[in-house]
Amino acid sequence: MRVKHAVVLLMLISPLSWAGTMTFQFRNPNFGGNPNNGAFLLNSAQAQNSYKDPSYNDDFGIETPSALDNFTQAIQSQILGGLLSNINTGKPGRMVTNDYIVDIANRDGQLQLNVTDRKTGQTSTIQVSGLQNNSTDF
């Protein structure tokens, strides 16, 4: 009876022990694997990399202006726009900021802007023709 059980047991287990051919495939494309795996492997390696280069500067030297700087710039733009819109009526204007002094006048149909840099003292004059003929001095 023991022999019968042993034979039956061997017959039941033997199909489970049949081995197939083992094949090995490289995963890494550097060693002959599928090149489509390259992006996946690179992303996996970068996700595991916790090293941060201390000399790496992420902002590319760009300084982000503060909310107060943005507000100041917006107010200056609005005032300068108001001065430019009043020039057609013959009203001259002047805007003084920390950096510049801007004088605006309508001289015989020409828009004249005198921009003075307060730090260096340099003056630039911009003249644009084609305005109405209302002459007004500073």
Curated annotation (Swiss-Prot):
Subcellular location: Cell outer membrane
GO cellular component terms, A-Z: cell outer membrane; curli secretion complex
InterPro entries: T8SS_CsgF
Molecular-function annotations in GO: identical protein binding
Keywords, sorted A to Z: Cell outer membrane, Membrane, Signal
Function as written in the Swiss-Prot or TrEMBL entry: May be involved in the biogenesis of curli organelles.
Name this polypeptide is given: Curli production assembly/transport component CsgF
Species whose genome carries this gene: Escherichia coli (strain K12)
